[in-house]
Curated annotation (Swiss-Prot):
The protein's Enzyme Commission number: 6.3.5.2
Protein name: GMP synthase [glutamine-hydrolyzing]
Domain Glutamine amidotransferase type-1: 5-195
Residues in GMPS ATP-PPase domain copies: 196-385
EC top class named in words: ligase
Pathway assignment: Purine metabolism; GMP biosynthesis; GMP from XMP (L-Gln route): step 1/1
InterPro entries: Class_I_gatase-like, GATASE, GMP_synth_C, GMP_synth_GATase, GMP_synthase, GMPS_ATP_PPase_dom, NAD/GMP_synthase, Rossmann-like_a/b/a_fold
Gene Ontology, cellular component aspect: cytosol
Quaternary structure note: Homodimer.
Source organism of this protein record: Geobacillus kaustophilus (strain HTA426)
Binding site for ATP: S223, G224, G225, V226, D227, S228, S229
Catalytic residues (UniProt): C82, H169, E171
Length: 510
């Protein structure tokens, strides 16, 4: 497919993914690439324009990130943001100097030149600055578009070559007209049409999957989570009964989850789903184990063995579907990433399983995967399912995992989810669940002394799960949840609410 694209070069900014996402919100496809990408690779991508992201370096640092100089010979529009503008200025013969003081936060810029980026926008704008260096003399051919009290060149342009630079961050919401400016670059400067939609994405992926698979057989490990569900339905749309899904019920799922998965995929989507009831097998392996890391390893390894056993029964499988997301690719693959993560989308499958991978979601962000799921007709309760750990309730039962304890977590968690949804808070809270700490306490129920379990409620708000704050659930909602749990769930006489942020605590207790 010859789709239009804006390429974003990653120079290490904390906002680089945000630039890509903003452009996609305009209906234009965009990809984030390492700053080391060669000019000929960009040409092969059929890019309509290039954006240089910000970054923590100074252009004068010995280890400063730079780019292939041939990029400036491609004849493509370029927008440099923050460090990206400084790099352009430095490379093209302008002057970059250390600022007398680092500028961080909101600033007021004055527009001095009615370039295409600023045409029709206010002469005074609030923007978001975050820089230690600044451009003090523009390169030849560039006009100064805007200034601020502490930044003599807050924006510059060479309209003949369609090259622009802004010292501020238009991708951040604090830059009031930032979105307008980015739109002007994408549509008016680069000439994009804005026809990248989920419908187009589905059509293109269906074509690619059919081309890749031909008449061969495909396997998918279905967890019931958002990513594996959307990937499975998309692949099924492309190749139908050539796809077989394996759903391992390890007995550590939430209430009604296994039934919901089977109903949705086997009945609604008419997919080949093999359900493996492995509850006894997992509980036997977990007997007497209290260490959380050991529990994780046992559950992860056992999942592999069960999946491997089932896969071995199937003949002629050549492909494996994985729900890898674009964020996984970015975090694992860019040279500027601060943290490298390894991602195991199906629980870390054995290396000797010689399958060719199908990763239909590996160009999408999480919110786009949800939009795709909705477009494919997947029910809201799956599309909007919260993050759920691979080991499931095995790490929400602290200490040894038993059937009795799992039942307490299952029932209390179901009450929590029901009441949160009833209160209209289910889309506001990032994640909410109950935990069973390995403690009992004294209580009084029906005039009799009790010595029973405590249930903890954990609910957090977050953007990406990296940091989180405890959710301010209204007292009356908490009261209803607590009353129902102690009245409806056997062996519970106390409910507590975890009011710790991340950091210092993690979202999960184990």
């Amino acid at each position: 497919m010859n789709q239009e694209m804006i390429v974003v070069l990653d120079f290490g900014s904390q906002y680089n993914q945000l630039i890509t996402r903003r452009i996609r919100e305009f209906g234009v496809y965009s990809e984030l690439h390492p700053h080391t990408i060669r000019a000929e690779e960009i040409r092969a991508l059929n890019a309509k324009g290039i954006i240089f992201s910000g970054g923590p370096n100074s252009v004068y640092d010995e280890q400063a990130f730079t780019c292939d100089p041939a990029i400036f010979e491609l004849g493509l529009p370029i927008l440099g943001i923050c460090y990206g503008m400084q790099l352009m200025a430095h490379h093209l013969g302008g002057k970059v100097e250390k600022a007398t003081h680092r500028e961080y936060g909101k600033a007021l810029i004055q527009v001095k030149n009615d370039s295409l980026l600023f045409h029709g926008l206010p002469d005074e704008q609030v923007v978001w600055m975050s820089h230690g260096d600044l451009v003090t003399a523009p390169p030849a051919g560039f006009a100064v578009d805007a200034t601020s009290p502490s930044c003599p060149i807050a924006a510059m342009s060479d309209e003949r070559r369609k090259w622009y630079g802004v010292q501020f961050h238009p991708e951040v919401r604090h830059s009031v007209y930032g979105n307008d400016l980015l739109k002007k670059f994408v549509f008016e400067v680069c000439g994009c049409r804005g026809d990248w939609t989920m419908e187009n994405f589905i059509d293109e992926q269906v074509r690619r999957i059919r081309e890749q698979v031909g008449g061969k057989k495909v396997l998918c490990a279905l967890s019931g989570g958002v990513d594996s569900s959307v990937a499975a339905v998309l692949v099924h749309r492309a190749i139908g009964d050539q796809l077989t899904c394996i759903f391992v019920d390890h007995g550590l799922l939430r209430k009604g989850e296994a039934e919901s998965v089977m109903k949705t995929f086997r009945e609604q989507f008419q997919m080949n789903v093999i359900k493996v009831d492995a509850k006894d097998r997992f509980l036997a392996k977990l007997k007497g184990v209290t260490d959380p890391e050991q529990k994780r390893k046992i559950i992860g390894n056992e999942f592999i063995y069960v999946f491997d056993d089932e896969a071995a029964k199937l003949e002629g499988i050549e492909f494996l579907v994985q729900g890898t997301l674009y964020t996984d690719i970015i975090e694992s693959g860019t040279a500027t990433a601060q943290t490298i993560k390894s991602h195991h989308n199906v629980g870390g499958l054995p290396e000797d399983m010689k399958f060719e991978l199908i990763e239909p979601l590996n160009t999408l962000f999480k919110d786009e995967v949800r939009a795709l799921g909705t477009q494919l007709g997947i029910p809201d309760e799956i599309v909007w399912r919260q993050p759920f750990p691979g080991p499931g309730l095995g790490i929400r039962v602290l200490g040894e995992v038993t059937e009795e304890k799992l039942e307490i977590v299952r029932e209390s968690d179901a009450i929590l989810r029901e009441e949160v949804k009833k209160a209209g808070l289910d889309r506001e809270i990032w994640q909410y669940f109950t935990v069973l700490p390995d403690i009992r306490s004294v209580g009084v129920m029906g005039d009799a002394r009790t010595y029973d379990y405590t249930v903890a409620i954990r609910a957090v708000t977050s953007i990406d799960g990296m940091t989180a704050d405890w959710a301010r659930i209204p007292w009356d909602v908490l009261e209803r949840i607590s009353t129902r749990i102690v009245n409806e769930v056997p062996h519970v006489n106390r409910v507590v609410y975890d009011i710790t942020s991340k950091p210092p605590a993690t979202i999960e207790w184990e």
